[in-house]
Design a protein with these regions (language model features):
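Active-site regions of metal-assisted phosphoester/phosphodiester hydrolases
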Residues: 1-153
């Protein structure tokens, strides 16, 4: 089962964001319990590695509501956040993926703040074989695409 997600970005109401995650997680857990393979990909509108500012040297000290670190502790057992797993494997110094999202508050000049906002969350019966951000230098959008290749266990 593939979920295409675009979670709420703006506003300081943490309850709305938590409710969206809870709904997604319940749907994902139900599908996994039914024996299905589960992948949820899209724009989570949170920092999906938790340290994007450090990785990309962002100039902005203030973290907007949509750029806050994701609640990784809330991810259900048996599911993995692809971007965080890659960061955990490589460490900050070894994480070389391009940002998936840039500050769109001004024209892009290569120095805009960047984050990893787009990723996949997959179930334990899905085995990733390749994961990366496709670095298009934000030519078409304020987001870069993310590619996940996987096999079903």
């Amino acid at each position: 089962v593939l979920f295409n997600v675009h979670l709420s970005a703006y506003g300081a109401d943490a309850a709305i964001m938590a409710a969206q995650r809870a709904t997604l997680y319940e749907d994902m857990k139900r599908e996994r319990a039914a024996g299905n393979y589960v992948v949820a990909g899209g724009d989570y509108n949170h920092d999906m590695i938790g340290v994007s500012g450090d990785v990309y040297g962002n100039a902005t000290d203030a973290v907007e509501s949509w750029a806050k670190p994701y609640d990784f502790d809330g991810v259900p057992e048996g599911f993995t956040v692809a971007s965080k797993a890659k960061l955990d494997e490589t460490g900050i110094a070894g994480f070389s993926d391009a940002g998936t999202c840039r500050d769109a508050g001004r024209p892009y000049d290569g120095t805009n703040d960047r984050w990893v906002m787009d990723t996949f969350i997959y179930s334990d019966n899905v085995e990733p074989t390749f994961y990366e951000t496709v670095d298009l230098d934000f030519a078409y959008s304020d987001h870069n695409p993310v590619l996940l290749k996987f096999r079903l266990k």
